[in-house]
């Protein structure tokens, strides 16, 4: 997987996005009790037993999910997520009014627009119906571009900036970056997910 020219062009385009790409952090009050966040709130790891955490209406209780602290209502926003060698993960955006206490299917009808790695080898867009993704190589870093004004969400392989999938007609008024580690199943999926800050030097 190599696309240096495409990568350079994309990086130049990022500078024109307004507002500029935000530095995201994870929201501890939204994190499922099995999730451990790093001190700088940029990475998340799942543990097999829950922690004792304060009650919060923002907290996910049934699935190992966490949201970013920031939400977006207008403009374009880009961020990258390092998934490395994880065997299972899901990421994208969620609407501000998703049901966090119940186990629901992550799909646009329920306020989620995501892609996922399933069974260590299958990439899917959680559309209706699901769409199988066939990237040219394993995804280790995923780029997410949210265009609130156009109601559009696009995913890229951030290591070579190839297009993965685009959701259209997003219907929420406010969007939160969304992350789900998947259960670790011992050591197989223990690697953390990490928010990257692509324009930080």
Predicted regions and their residues:
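Beta-rich ligand-recognition domains in immune and ubiquitin systems
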Residues: 1-201
């Amino acid at each position: 997987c190599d696309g240096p020219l495409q990568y350079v062009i994309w990086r130049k385009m990022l500078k024109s996005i307004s507002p500029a790409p935000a530095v995201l952090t994870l929201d501890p009050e939204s994190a499922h009790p099995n999730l451990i966040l790093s001190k700088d709130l940029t990475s998340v790891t799942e543990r097999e037993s829950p922690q004792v955490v304060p009650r919060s209406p923002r907290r996910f209780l049934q699935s190992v999910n966490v949201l970013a602290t920031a939400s977006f209502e207008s403009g374009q926003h880009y961020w990258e997520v390092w998934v490395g060698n994880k065997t299972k993960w899901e990421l994208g955006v969620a609407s501000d009014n998703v049901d966090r206490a119940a186990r629901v299917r992550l799909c646009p009808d329920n306020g989620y627009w995501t892609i996922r790695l399933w069974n260590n080898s299958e990439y899917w867009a959680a559309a209706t119906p699901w769409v199988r993704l066939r990237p040219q190589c394993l995804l280790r870093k995923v780029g997410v571009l949210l265009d609130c004004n156009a109601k559009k969400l696009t995913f890229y392989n951030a290591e070579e900036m190839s297009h993965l999938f685009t959701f259209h007609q997003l219907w929420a008024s406010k969007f939160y970056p969304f992350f789900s580690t998947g259960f670790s199943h011992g050591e197989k999926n223990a690697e953390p997910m990490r928010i990257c800050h692509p324009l930080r030097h």
